[in-house]
UniProtKB/Swiss-Prot annotation:
The chain crosses the membrane at residues 45-65. This is Beta-fructofuranosidase, soluble isoenzyme I. N-glycosylated; high-mannose and high-xylose complex glycans. There are at least three isozymes of beta-fructofuranosidase in carrot: one insoluble and two soluble ones. It is found in: Membrane; Vacuole; Vacuole lumen. Its EC number is 3.2.1.26. Monomer. May be present in two forms, a 70 kDa monomer and a heterodimer of the 30 kDa and 38 kDa subunits. The ratio of the levels of the two forms within cells appears to be regulated developmentally. Substrate binds at residues 142-145, 161, 169, 204-205, 268-269, 323, 356. It is an enzyme of class 3 (hydrolase). Residues 1-115 form a propeptide. The gene is INV*DC4. It comes from Daucus carota. The lineage of its organism: Eukaryota, Viridiplantae, Streptophyta, Embryophyta, Tracheophyta. One of its GO terms (molecular function) is beta-fructofuranosidase activity. Residues 66-661 are lumenal.
């Protein structure tokens, strides 16, 4: 068994304003006051401190009372034998444990209802159809953030936030799965459970750091019995085990407490560490001061004792709480990914934050100063939280890691549900992970990254369909003869009639995807694109489309949008229009790629410059009734479209076959 010699048992140096209760168990290791003073560092940006949010005793009661946690669940997904698990209905009950809310550092789920009775009469067939076939998800229950992804001894490892008891948030445990190819997965036993005072209310989000000698360090946030967010250390019990089945929590956890000036519920989600020129490791942790989102900086040599730096890595006023911060380098000249510690000429750094206030992931490109441990955005107008988003749809708490096996940086993201919690309870599961994406610097624009599905997903492609140079006149609709449209990989390009475009002097210069009428709103130069998950009478449809706006100066701006407003006849689902503008360079065709997997549509424009993830819950356009159409709803321009589509096989997701070892 491997031992971690860099993890000696000793007192911790805590820069903390938090002190455990006097009646805490003897197993707790309280900070040494003298040592604590040594590392107390004032944060220069802090002029005033918000008091911690009041934690209601009623919430605590609900969380710990097992009787209350028994919530009606009527599961309709299939078991491993293909049998329907839904045998009988139960009368609606009041929901037990509430969703993780602002008091615990995370916003409520959208469309939360007071009872388990859905407002729409979902059938078993409808709910069963919603389960994806080639996206990662547990066999049942709730999942959220991806955690600590890494590659070890031939296996990709994914850990994730998981509730083993219900399809709603609670009792957060680290699920664990492995894969050879990032597509087909084997479920393993839980990696870590909430069983210590420092994580009894949840083993929250964390990151893995693979050291130069191959050792693995896992830092994660624990929610203590006092509902205080602290950082903890864990490591594999046996590094020679390719499955990494057993994890040891460091005996002297926590290794970091909320520092002075930081609220006890505003300190979470440590990043992967990177090593500086001084030989010390750095990590950053998201937080806030008033309405300013910040990224705290720490140094360590052994991952046990930490020095809080005077300066912040970065801060952006008005962005609120930063969580799930990610920080990594990208090459501006090469096509490979970079290890997190790489810096120097030809390198830019991506800083990404998940904003708790609006539940979106924002990123910016910039320069990292390793001497002063400061990051500066290339364009302050596109700073973190006010500029570019990783994904303009339902996508949150994303996490990258460096795949040393294939020299690429890979991105995971949590795709939550946008139906009601009561519907989630009926189907017995909630949330999936995105298809992993490669991340590279866009050398053509120099202003953004490119995200693209990993090549391994193409192994699921089967029967193909291709159509070239189809003219779409204004107002036209062309069905594509695809027999099964619930699992598709679609690549399409569009050419706008050049003469008509040049003859248009002004067209919807103030267009905005989210404030528009969606694909039904007709303009001179758009919308045009693809309808997926549509039925023949078009009573349900999900358009993904381009829309070109042109100002009086002749400059055009292209938008990429996904319209959910008519995606379902159900009333208790999200029906927003998502999207944003997408850079289109001179000579480029308009291009999109869509991954359709039942209730998920992941859409990529212009090679991944703009990405949108949609959750849709059709009631009619399901199974054999699902169709695909090309459309052009513009009033003043014809479009020529070419499409290639593949039906996608289902990925394998099953328990690891321990009985075959």
């Amino acid at each position: 068994m491997d031992t971690y010699h860099f993890l000696p048992s000793r007192d911790l140096e805590h820069a903390s304003s938090y002190t455990p209760r006097p009646d805490s168990p003897e197993t707790r290791h309280e900070p040494d006051p003298d040592r604590s003073k040594t590392n107390r560092r004032p944060i220069k940006i802090v002029s005033s401190v918000l008091l911690s949010t009041l934690i209601l005793s009623f919430v605590i009661f609900l969380l710990v009372n097992p009787n209350v946690q028994q919530v009606v669940r009527k599961k309709v997904s299939k078991n491993s034998n293909g049998e329907d698990r839904n045998k009988a209905s139960k009368s609606p009950e009041m929901l037990g444990p509430p969703s993780r809310g602002v008091s615990q550092g995370v916003s409520e789920k959208s469309f939360r209802q007071a009872t388990a009775e859905p407002s729409y009469p979902w059938t078993n067939d409808m709910l069963s159809w919603q389960r994806t076939s080639f996206h990662f998800q547990p066999q049942e229950n709730w999942m959220n953030d991806p955690n600590g992804p890494l590659f070890h001894m031939g296996w990709y490892h994914l850990f994730y936030q998981y509730n083993p008891d219900s399809a709603i948030w609670g009792n957060i445990t680290w699920g664990h799965a492995i894969s050879r190819d990032l597509i087909n997965w084997l479920h393993l036993p839980f990696a870590m459970q909430p069983d210590q005072w420092y994580d009894i209310n949840g083993v929250w989000t964390g990151s893995a750091t693979v050291l130069p000698d191959g050792k693995i360090v896992m830092l994660y946030t624990g929610d203590t019995d006092d509902l205080v967010q602290v950082q903890n250390l864990a490591y594999p019990a046996n590094l020679s085990d390719p499955l990494l089945l057993d994890w040891i929590k460091y005996p002297d956890n926590p290794v970091m407490f909320p520092p002075p000036g930081i609220g006890s519920t505003d300190f979470r989600d440590p990043t992967t560490a990177w090593i500086g020129r001084d030989g010390k490791w750095r990590i950053t942790i998201g937080s806030k001061v008033n309405k300013t989102g910040i990224s705290l900086m720490y140094k360590t040599t052994d991952f046990i004792t930490y020095e809080l730096l005077d300066n912040l890595l970065h801060a952006v006023p008005g962005t609120g709480m930063w969580e799930c911060v990610d920080f990594y380098p990208v090459s501006v000249t090469g096509s490979n990914g970079l290890d997190t510690s790489v810096n120097g000429p030809g390198v830019k750094h991506v800083l990404k934050s998940s904003l708790d206030d609006d539940r979106h992931d924002y990123y910016a490109l910039g320069t990292y100063d390793p001497i002063n441990d400061k990051w500066t955005p290339d364009n302050p107008e596109l700073d973190v939280g006010i500029g570019l988003r990783l994904d303009y749809g339902k996508y949150y708490a994303s996490k990258t890691f460096y795949d040393q096996d294939k020299e690429r940086r890979l991105l995971w993201g949590w795709i939550g549900e946008t139906d009601s919690e009561s519907a989630d309870l009926l189907k017995g599961w909630a949330s999936v992970q995105s298809i992993p994406r490669t991340v590279v610097f866009d050398k053509k624009t120099g202003t953004n990254i490119l995200q693209w599905p990993v090549k391994e997903v193409e192994s699921l492609r089967s029967r193909s369909y291709e159509i070239d140079d189809v003219e779409l006149k204004p107002g036209s609709l062309v069905p594509l003869k695809i027999s099964s449209a619930a699992q598709l990989d679609i690549v399409a390009s569009f050419e706008v009639d050049e003469e008509a475009f040049k003859g248009t002097y002004e067209a919807d210069a103030s267009y905005n995807c989210t404030a528009s009428e969606g694909a039904a709103g007709r303009g001179i130069l758009g919308p045009f694109g693809i309808l997926v998950l549509a039925d023949d009478p078009l009573s349900e449809l999900t358009p993904v489309y381009f829309y070109i706006a042109k100002g009086v100066d002749g400059n055009a701006k292209t938008y990429f949008c996904a319209d959910q407003s008519r995606s379902s006849t159900a009333s208790d689902v999200d029906k927003e229009v998502y999207g944003s503008d997408v850079p289109v360079l001179h000579g480029e065709s308009l291009s999109m790629r869509l991954l359709v997997d039942h209730s998920i549509v992941e859409s990529f424009a212009q090679g991944g410059r703009t990405v949108i993830t949609s959750r849709v819950y059709p009631t009619r356009a399901i199974y054999s009734a699902a169709r695909v159409f090309l459309f052009n709803n513009a009033t003043g321009v014809s479009v020529t479209a070419s499409v290639k589509a593949w039906q996608m096989a289902s990925a394998t997701l099953k328990p690891f076959p321990f009985d075959q070892l």
